[in-house]
């Protein structure tokens, strides 16, 4: 996977965390930079870990589905992208918010980080079938998520839940586009090989 594809994938995967961070930022009385950075750090560490877990699972099963690797990556990306779009549209303009605390609890942030990183784990499964440096890719995903979640917290109270919803929709569309790109690249190479 190219450098630019890795950045685009990381940006797409960080949109879930960004959308949640916007919502979390909107629920805080006044989000401070330290709280935003803490949220970004927690989300980033989790988001960097889950693709590696998924990648390891993918390697374990790769011998059974190597002929369909491009279809697996395509299917996972389309399903996850579609799920992001569906959940965003289903939720509507509502932001799942609480009363305005001064800061969010660590356990709450960890649970939210895990929930938003399940798509990254599934992507990791798909990445096991591609020639990627998983550590570099996971670090890029984690750093992008940290940056986006931190920014989301800081600007959440100003832009509210509407942009958070649009960010999720855009992230879903990008994942679907990457899935089609992987499929078309593989099918194109397959056609030239025969």
UniProtKB/Swiss-Prot annotation:
- GO molecular function annotation: manganese ion transmembrane transporter activity
The gene that this protein is the product of is mntP
Q: Name one GO cellular component term.
A: plasma membrane
Its biological purpose: Probably functions as a manganese efflux pump.
Where this protein primarily resides, as one coarse class? Answer: membrane
Transmembrane segment boundaries: 3-23, 40-60, 65-85, 109-129, 134-154, 169-189
Give the protein's recorded name. Putative manganese efflux pump MntP
Q: Which NCBIfam families match?
A: PRK11469.1
What keywords are assigned to this protein? Cell inner membrane, Cell membrane, Ion transport, Manganese, Membrane, Transmembrane, Transmembrane helix, Transport
The entry sums up its family as follows: Belongs to the MntP (TC 9.B.29) family.
Q: How does it sit in the membrane?
A: Multi-pass membrane protein
- Intracellular or extracellular location(s): Cell inner membrane
């Amino acid at each position: 996977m190219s450098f630019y594809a890795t950045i685009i994938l990381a940006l797409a995967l960080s949109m879930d965390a960004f959308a949640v961070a916007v919502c979390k930022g909107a629920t805080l009385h006044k989000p401070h930079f330290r709280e935003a950075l803490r949220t970004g750090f927690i989300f980033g560490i989790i988001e960097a870990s889950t693709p590696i877990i998924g990648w390891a699972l993918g390697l374990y099963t790769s011998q059974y589905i190597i002929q369909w690797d491009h279809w697996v990556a395509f299917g996972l990306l389309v399903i996850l992208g579609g799920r992001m779009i569906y959940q965003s549209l289903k939720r509507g303009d509502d932001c799942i918010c609480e009363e305005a605390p001064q800061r969010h609890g660590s356990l709450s942030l960890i649970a939210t980080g895990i929930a938003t990183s399940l798509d990254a784990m599934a992507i990791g499964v798909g990445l096991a079938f591609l020639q990627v440096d998983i550590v570099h890719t996971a670090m890029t995903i984690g750093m992008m998520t940290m940056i986006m979640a931190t920014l989301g917290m800081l600007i959440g109270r100003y832009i509210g839940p509407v942009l958070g919803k649009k960010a999720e929709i855009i992230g879903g569309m990008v994942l679907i586009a990457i899935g089609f790109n992987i499929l078309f690249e593989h099918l194109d190479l397959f056609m030239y090989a025969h």
